[in-house]
Amino acid sequence: MQFTLIFFYATLAAFGLAAPSEQVGRDVVQEGDELDKRINFKIPYTGADLVDGDDVQEGDKLDKRINFKIPYTGADMVDGDDVQEGDKLDKRIGFKLPYRGADMVDGDDVQEGDELAKRPNFKMPYKGADM
């Protein structure tokens, strides 16, 4: 028992003396020090070897993809007109979700296509703690 305590305290003393009391090293960062930005951080180009027929070498500066567009892959017919690749499509004006709720709103019969008023002052019930 005594040997265990002596060994324990000797180990603590040895590690305590071996550990440096100050941070050792070059350019130690302290709390509150302003850090430099990573200068000229660039993502390496890992794309194709040919751009517009020109051979691309490592380190070449590449142009941005001007007017990059996602190709249209939707239906072939829009409003009865044949849609060709490259045609500019209009936005869906007045797109509305169909009403699929109850048949009665405030005692009135609701028909398909009727415009429904927004629910004023709709509130979620409070389900939190009492205090």
Curated annotation (Swiss-Prot):
Propeptide at: 19-38, 48-65, 75-92, 102-119, 129-131
Give the source's domain of life in one word: Eukaryota
Q: What post-translational modification does the entry describe? A: GigA is processed by several endopeptidases including kexin proteases to produce 2 identical copies of the nonaxapeptide Ile-Asn-Phe-Lys-Ile-Pro-Tyr-Thr-Gly, one copy of the nonaketide Ile-Gly-Phe-Lys-Leu-Pro-Tyr-Arg-Gly and one copy of the nonaketide Pro-Asn-Phe-Lys-Met-Pro-Tyr-Arg-Gly, that are further modified into phomapsins B, C and A, respectively. After being excised from the precursor peptide, the core peptides are cyclized and modified post-translationally by enzymes encoded within the gene cluster.
* Keywords on record: Repeat, Signal
* Signal sequence range: 1-18
Q: In which pathway does it act?
A: Mycotoxin biosynthesis
Q: What is the purpose of this protein?
A: Ribosomally synthesized cyclic peptide phomopsin precursor; part of the gene cluster that mediates the biosynthesis of the epichloecyclins, a group of nonapeptides, with a likely cyclic structure and dimethylation of the conserved lysine. The gigA translated product contains 4 repeated peptide embedding the nonapeptide Ile-Asn-Phe-Lys-Ile-Pro-Tyr-Thr-Gly in repeats 1 and 2, Ile-Gly-Phe-Lys-Leu-Pro-Tyr-Arg-Gly in repeat 3, and Pro-Asn-Phe-Lys-Met-Pro-Tyr-Arg-Gly in repeat 4 that are converted into epichloecyclins B, C and A, respectively.
Q: What is this protein called?
A: Ribosomally synthesized cyclic peptide phomopsin precursor gigA
- Source organism per entry reads Epichloe festucae (strain Fl1)
Its gene is: nc25
